[in-house]
């Protein structure tokens, strides 16, 4: 994407001075003349949202709209609707705002106002309904002759979602929207469309995506109003997110720190803290990652809560003997609209399930990969296949073949593909695993590198090479206090014992499994298939009392769920 303005000079400036400061308020709003009596209410609702009181803020806006006289300005309703979506997005009330926004759209008289409210409603919609709502908004903006409105609606249409549109079509629509935005010379419209197009390019793994996120983040001046600041923060956040996904951790960390400094309110500060936590986890600084994740979770549940929960779940798996997987289950509800984070959470949860010796630990992964393939996404799902390759190489081999055309070619994507190829090749994968480990070490992603070195040791051509690789893995895990991974290598029976080997970390001593014992796994597998206690006893040649005791212990380890619910939870493909 060519630069809209001479950006080279700004790129040379110190990070803190990159964004210009605008004296114009409500740069992003379609409401041009808001009534004087409404302005203090909008300021109060915004302040409540910035403090994290998003539900009361939304309630205030709904009550204010209901009290407007029938002849109130269209702009008043537009301003209320725009702010309602922003404060709802800061919390978890977007779905609650849907009926309100639809009602507002029926109360305005001009096509421009209807277009603005439908555009706002479309941005808050689900994947299935959004295209139709945005098409209605586009029609209204065309009736009004509003080029700016048409531009941002096309920009929103190009954003990747599970709606059946092809990736190439999205890029075409996004470029058209950006071209219209440039015609308006409106910085918010340009930033909005540039960011949505960069998001589309990211999911298609286009090499220019990272550069285009930088352009989108830098073009918009900082602004004191919430609606404009939302896109400024969103572009900065997605720039960091994309750099993280590419394995460019130095850039991701820097962009997240800059974003946190300029964040408009606690919600965005927490989201940037969550990105920092992800970077720290990947780069092996588990203590810092846990601290950043806890900071990101301080406040009302929202997307940052889920992102940080992924990190805390991953750190707990390394540091605790029997980590509670509930934090990952809870996190999924807060990140359902971000596929990149949703797939990462599923990958980490599958790793937990493997460590807990659950039946069918990969049960969520095939459906997630099918969704990615249906969306033609080439970014963010590769960790699902890496987890699969460690646990079920044959299944991973099938995925590797079926999704070959969608495999990401960014630096981390290439490293993951090499790792998967090495794991599925078995004894022939030694050299490929070593190459993958070196690529991960260079990112740096030391814990992933250590696991691949341990895997390479298992297929080494001779015992001496295998032990050398195990010791390299031990060094990485010990340096980064990755207790469970370290214990796994130390318990490897093929490891040559020596006086210089460290002891099994205290958190992993006397802990043979993170969850189920071997017998409990056998019982749980049969329970998942609907076997009764008597049938389990007959199948395993144990007494019915012993079978019932095992079922009871398994239920306790899954939070005390009833046996019928346990079977549903563990069912393969559930």
Give the predicted meaning of each segment.
Residues 1-34, 490, 505-510, 573-574:
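Actinobacteria-biased recognition of intrinsically disordered, low-complexity terminal regions
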Residues 41-44, 418, 519-522, 526:
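Solvent-exposed, amphipathic alpha-helical segments
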Residues 71, 212-215, 239-513, 531, ...:
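Helix-coil-helix junctions within alpha-helical repeat/solenoid scaffolds
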Residues 11, 18-279, 289, 308:
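Internal alpha-solenoid helical repeat scaffolds
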Residues 63-67, 103, 334, 367, ...:
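Amphipathic alpha-helical regulatory segments at dimerization interfaces
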Residues 502-552, 556-558, 564-574:
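Helix-turn-helix DNA-binding segment
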Residues 36-40, 132, 172, 235, ...:
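Alpha-helix N-cap/N′ positions at the starts of helices
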């Amino acid at each position: 994407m060519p630069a809209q303005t001479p950006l080279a000079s700004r790129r040379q400036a110190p990070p803190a001075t990159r964004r210009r400061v605008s004296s114009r308020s409500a740069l992003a709003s379609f409401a041009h003349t808001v009534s004087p009596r409404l302005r203090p209410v909008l300021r109060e609702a915004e302040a409540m949202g910035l403090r994290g009181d998003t539900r009361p803020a939304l309630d205030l806006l709904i009550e204010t709209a209901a009290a407007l006289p029938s002849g109130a300005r269209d702009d008043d309703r537009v301003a209320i609707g725009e702010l309602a979506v922003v404060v709802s997005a800061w919390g978890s009330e977007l779905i609650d705002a849907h009926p309100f926004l639809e009602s507002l759209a029926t109360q305005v008289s001009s096509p421009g106002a209807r277009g603005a409210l439908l555009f706002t409603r479309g941005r808050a919609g689900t994947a299935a309904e959004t295209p139709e709502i945005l098409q209605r908004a586009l029609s209204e903006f065309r009736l009004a002759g509003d080029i700016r409105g048409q531009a941002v609606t096309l920009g929103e249409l190009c954003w990747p979602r599970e709606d059946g549109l092809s990736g190439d079509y999205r890029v075409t629509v996004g470029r058209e929207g950006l071209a219209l935005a440039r015609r308006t010379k409106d910085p918010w419209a340009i930033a909005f469309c540039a960011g949505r197009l960069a998001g589309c390019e990211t999911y298609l793994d286009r090499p220019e995506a990272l550069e285009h996120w930088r352009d989108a983040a830098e073009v918009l001046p900082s602004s004191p109003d919430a609606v404009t600041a939302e896109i400024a923060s969103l572009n900065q956040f997605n720039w960091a997110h994309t750099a993280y996904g590419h394995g460019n951790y130095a850039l991701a960390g820097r962009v997240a720190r800059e974003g946190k400094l300029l964040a408009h309110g606690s919600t965005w500060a927490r989201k940037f803290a969550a990105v920092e936590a992800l970077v720290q986890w990947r780069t092996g600084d588990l203590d810092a990652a846990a601290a950043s994740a806890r900071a990101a979770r301080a406040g009302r549940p929202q997307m940052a809560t889920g992102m940080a929960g992924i990190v805390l779940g991953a750190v707990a798996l390394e540091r605790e003997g029997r980590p509670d997987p509930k934090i990952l289950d809870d996190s999924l509800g807060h990140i359902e609209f971000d596929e990149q984070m949703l797939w990462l959470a599923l990958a980490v949860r599958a790793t937990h399930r493997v460590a807990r010796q659950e039946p069918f630990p990969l049960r969520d992964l095939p459906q997630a990969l099918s969704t990615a393939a249906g969306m033609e996404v080439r970014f963010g799902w590769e960790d699902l296949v890496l987890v699969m390759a460690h646990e079920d190489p044959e299944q991973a081999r099938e995925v590797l073949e079926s999704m070959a055309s969608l495999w990401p070619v960014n630096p981390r994507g290439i490293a993951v593909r090499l790792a998967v190829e090495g794991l599925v090749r078995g004894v022939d994968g030694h050299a490929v695993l070593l190459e993958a480990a070196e690529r991960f070490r260079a990112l740096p992603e030391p814990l992933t590198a250590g696991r691949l070195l341990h895997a390479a040791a298992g297929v080494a051509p001779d015992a001496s090479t295998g032990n050398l690789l195990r010791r390299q893995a031990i060094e990485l895990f010990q340096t980064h206090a990755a207790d469970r991974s370290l214990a796994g290598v130390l318990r490897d029976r093929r490891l040559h014992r020596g006086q210089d080997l460290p002891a099994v970390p205290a958190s992993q001593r006397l802990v043979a499994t993170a969850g189920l014992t071997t017998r409990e796994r056998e019982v749980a597998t049969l329970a998942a298939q609907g076997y009764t206690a008597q049938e389990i006893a007959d199948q395993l040649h144990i007494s019915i009392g012993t079978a019932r005791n095992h079922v009871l212990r398994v239920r306790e380890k899954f939070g005390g769920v009833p046996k019928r619910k346990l079977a549903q939870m563990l069912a393969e493909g559930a």
